[in-house]
Design a protein with these regions (language model features):
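Acidic, low-complexity intrinsically disordered tails
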Residues: 562-569, 665-744
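Short hydrophobic alpha-helical segments enriched in small aliphatic residues
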Residues: 753, 774, 783-786, 790, ...
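Conserved DEDDh/DEDDy metal-dependent 3′-5′ exonuclease domain
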Residues: 3-4, 15-19, 23-190, 395, ...
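Generic long, charged, amphipathic alpha-helical segments
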Residues: 428-451, 564-613
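Short, low-complexity segments with poor structural confidence in diverse proteins
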Residues: 800-809, 814-824, 828-830, 834, ...
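Conserved "right-hand" nucleotidyltransferase catalytic core of DNA-directed polymerases
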Residues: 1-9, 14, 106, 117, ...
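Compositionally biased, intrinsically disordered low-complexity segments enriched in Pro/Arg/Gln/His
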Residues: 737, 746-751, 760-774, 778-784, ...
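Active-site palm subdomain of RNA-directed nucleic acid polymerases
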Residues: 193-199, 602-625
Length: 868
């Protein structure tokens, strides 16, 4: 089969980037200017309107047609060249795309950067690019000039000059088109680009068919959203102008808003969501409060989202086509660069679908009852996609697929067992976040309430791929909790997932070994799912259990740039943020790529099965599959069963999910959701009337236990508590969360953390250092030695709190060391700090105890210099 490389140049009044290839191609003004083509390694030829149809395009069945971006060329062929110039339709199976092949090998999509990455010569002719812009679109409209026009040339001379300039532009355009064909041919045949696997080639063809099919846009709803947004923006802008006396006239004037806020003593460098919320949380003056509140309301871009969807919808049938890009990410996941359908907000607020009617009616009052109207509209924007008349959308998506895949790859059996139990019973008590919270906090799952569940959720989302404090804050938006508290939660998550933590190390080690030795490396032996690392001298590949490989071009092993004694990292080149630059990855990041790639392959197999059954897949988003079917022809259970059908390569992987259907892509919620956690909590776990504010009570009883204020001198704090506190309930909750039996250091001493030796000499030094600190600790526990780094006069102390429950009185005894005259109150830590070695009057010969209330709880010993 011969290969035809071709590139087409067109003219249109329609904007290609703003409307997409399909709307551009069907526009009445769109026409072909010329196209160039080459047969195999032959000479590049040019076709222009009026020329006969080339033979290879008249009989396309026996040829393969390769273009750089086949979305554009296929649309121009179907809607321009075939109906107007007599070209023969080319079967979809005979098309191929050089850009998709490059993306599948983790190389850039843009031609110039791709040639740079593939070491191919490429010359960007700025004159030819300018000529292409002049010929491909009408000249920009100019404002009428106020200057007096002076006639310098006669019309005939101007016409001749225009014709000469146009002829010169066509010459430059032809040269540019020929250069594009040569570049496409060289890139497509580059030895650095490995061909697609047969199943991936089949997926590429299915992707083109799904993009051609498209999904319907809900035009009335989108138009109503635009009108609603315009009214809200107008009201916000009017108020801003009134407040600032015309200084700020629009909520989009970010520099002016920052200037106005900073003039009142603030130091805002950005107006991002977190920055604005942080300033508002500190209760600024009324002017700052109102102006930032208006900015927060006006920051929602729901109006722009609706306009973008309308612009990409076909004027013929309102369907959005070409919205999905195959290999939008290096892991193989799809993206939606044009209309950005993957960026549509979920209905996280669980708003009723009845509010869609309120948007259609422009009912601001009803919308305002559920929050800011712009925010409500943003949460409902998935209603902008709908089914065709007489059809429904059946949407099925995997549940916690990344957590499931990670546990399956690493062999975290307790988690896999929990997923299987949840899939069988559908008991919300067994939800993954509750199970993780129970494992992290070492409590019974029946005692997991909403705060503990949120901790489990945050840990699962932030720590699954090795994330630490930064990842936790980024995912949760928590900027107030101390680092030590968050690190305590992170350590608990890692302690509950020892095999996942081990898997990060195995993957990083296998990748480094493959690069260093050039030999195939298995991450884990059978029967674990097979993940292999290989290196061909230039690119590292990680082969997934499905058989597909993720590529890391120009990979090499480099020292860690984050930790002095950390493991080496893998450096490779990536098209990050549109730039071909070097980036780094370690074991956790590589595991994230493997997990996302495996989840993507699960979705790919589901798409193939659905299309094989004759179902019409119209859209898919990350882990979700959307099928359009005539009403009553297909059930939700059938689609969900197909999605959860495990492929042969994923044996033992528990899959779960949910499904909903209706005329809209938005999930229907007829009534406010029930608080499942509150319903399933047992009566014995409900807070008592005297202990409704857990955080406040904890801070009152145990200073700094929940990030509270600095502890005060107990001698000066003799005033009785005016707020009744259920101390027994407090102790019970602290025991459930694993907070008892941990004391803070009461003086400074060095921490060595995860110190690692890079040489035998350094190893001996570390051993001596650790032995020295362990020896100091043993002597300190028995009261015979004071740590040499302790601040003079800051001795240790233990505080005994006791309560006489029969008499209803409380007493507190304070014991100080011989080196200080000022007692220091004892502290309880929520973050798992190690014991400080304080002398404790309740200590006996068998164990060290610290009394809290009427009971004494043992304090476990920890090795100095190691994380608890």
């Amino acid at each position: 089969m011969t290969t035809i490389y071709w590139d087409v140049e067109t003219y249109s009044e329609c904007n290609l980037e703003g409307h997409g290839a399909h709307v551009y191609a069907i526009h009445k003004s769109t026409d072909g200017l010329l196209f160039c083509y080459a047969i195999d390694d032959g000479e590049i030829q040019t076709w222009m309107p009026g020329d006969p149809v080339p033979v290879v395009f008249a009989n396309p069945a026996d040829h393969k047609f390769v273009s750089d971006n086949w979305d554009f060329e296929r649309q121009i062929l179907e809607h321009v060249l075939v109906p107007r110039y007599g070209f023969a339709p080319i079967p979809l199976e005979n098309h191929d795309c050089a850009q998709r092949l490059a993306l599948a090998n983790a190389y850039p999509a843009k031609v110039s950067r791709r040639c740079e990455a593939l070491d191919l010569p490429f010359r960007e002719d700025t004159d030819a690019r300018a000529a292409m812009r002049r010929l491909s679109s009408p000249p920009p409209s100019k404002k009428p000039s106020k200057r007096k026009k002076v006639k310098t040339e006669d019309p005939d001379t101007l016409a001749a000059a225009f014709a000469a300039a146009r002829e010169h532009d066509f010459k430059l355009l032809r040269e540019r088109c020929q250069n594009d064909v040569a570049t496409t041919r060289a890139a497509y045949n580059s030895p650095l680009l490995k061909p697609l696997l047969p199943e991936e080639r089949h997926t590429l063809v299915l992707d083109a068919a799904i993009n051609t099919r498209g999904i319907c846009a809900n035009v009335p709803f989108l138009q109503a959203v635009i009108a609603l947004a315009d009214e809200e923006y107008a009201a916000i802008n009017a108020r801003l102008s009134e407040m600032t006396e015309g200084e700020i006239t629009a909520v989009t004037q970010v520099p002016r808003i920052k200037k106005a806020v900073n003039a009142r003593g603030h130091k805002m460098t950005t107006l991002g969501k977190r920055s604005v919320s942080a300033v508002l949380a500190h209760q600024p003056d009324d002017f700052t409060q109102e102006i930032l509140t208006l900015r927060k309301k006006g920051a929602y871009t729901v109006g722009g989202t609706a306009k973008r969807l309308l612009a990409h919808a076909s004027p013929e049938d309102s369907r959005i086509r070409g919205a999905l890009r195959y290999y939008g990410g290096a892991t193989g996941r799809w993206s939606s660069p044009g209309p950005q359908l993957h960026g549509l907000n979920r209905n996280d607020s669980e708003l009723s679908i009845d509010l869609v009617d309120a948007v259609l009616a422009g009912d601001h009052t009803t919308l305002a009852q559920h929050g800011d109207p712009l925010k409500v509209a943003a949460n409902l924007c998935r209603a902008g996609l709908c089914a065709a008349p007489g059809h429904v959308l059946i949407c099925a998506d995997f549940g916690a697929v990344e957590s499931r895949v990670t546990a399956w790859l690493a062999g975290e059996e307790w988690k896999l067992k929990g997923f299987r139990e949840y899939d069988i019973t559908h008991d919300e008590r067994l939800h993954v976040y509750r199970q993780v919270a129970a494992q992290m906090l070492n409590i019974n799952i029946d005692n997991v309430r909403q705060p503990e569940r949120q901790t489990g959720k945050s840990g699962e989302l932030a720590c699954n791929f090795g994330g630490s404090i930064g990842a936790w804050r980024k995912i949760t938006g928590d900027t107030d909790t101390p680092d030590a508290v968050l690190m305590g939660y992170i350590k608990k998550w890692r302690k509950a997932h020892p095999k996942i933590v081990r898997y990060w190390q195995l993957v990083g080690r296998a990748a480094r070994a493959a690069i260093r030795t050039g030999k195939l490396q298995f991450v884990a032996p059978a029967p674990a799912p097979q993940v292999m690392a290989a290196y061909d001298g230039r690119a590292l590949t990680l082969t997934l259990p499905s058989g597909r490989a993720i590529t890391y071009p120009n990979a090499r092993v480099v020292p860690s740039d984050k930790f002095e004694d950390g493991d080496p990292e893998v450096e490779f080149f990536d098209n990050a943020r549109g730039q071909w630059t070097a980036v780094r990855a370690w074991g956790g990041k590589l595991v994230e790529n493997i997990v996302q790639g495996t989840a993507r392959d699960l979705l790919r197999d589901a798409i193939i099965r659905a299309e094989a059954r004759g179902w019409k897949v119209v859209f898919h988003c990350h882990d979700e599959l959307v099928v359009e079917a005539p009403e009553g022809s297909l059930s939700e259970s059938e689609v969900l069963a197909l999605l959860l059908e495990s492929p042969p390569w994923a044996a033992g992987l528990p899959l779960g999910g949910k499904v909903h259907s209706g005329p809209l892509y938005l999930e229907a919620l007829e009534s406010p959701p029930k608080d499942k956690i509150a319903e399933q909590s047992t009566a014995t776990n409900k807070p008592s009337a005297t202990d409704t504010d857990w955080n406040a009570a904890l801070e009152r009883e145990f200073p700094r236990a929940n990030g509270g204020p600095k502890p005060v001198d107990p001698v000066e704090d003799e005033a009785p508590q005016t707020t009744p506190v259920d101390e027994a309930a407090i102790r019970q909750r602290m025991a459930e969360q694993g907070l008892l039996g941990r004391a803070r250091r009461l003086h400074k001493r060095p921490r060595h953390g995860r110190a690692r030796a890079s040489s035998p000499r350094q190893l001996r030094r570390l051993k001596r250092r650790r032995h020295r600190h362990q020896h100091c600790r043993r002597r300190r526990l028995h009261g015979r030695h004071r740590h040499p780094n302790a601040r003079r006069g800051a001795g240790t102390v233990a505080v005994i709190r006791s309560a006489d429950t029969s008499a209803g009185t409380r007493s507190q005894s304070t014991f100080t060391s011989t080196r200080t005259a000022r007692p220091i109150s004892g502290l309880i830590s929520t973050s798992g700090f190690r014991h400080a070695g304080a002398r404790n009057p309740t200590r006996n010969t068998s164990s060290t105890k610290m009394a809290i209330g009427p009971r004494a709880h043992p304090i476990p010993s920890f090795r100095i210099g190691y994380p608890s």
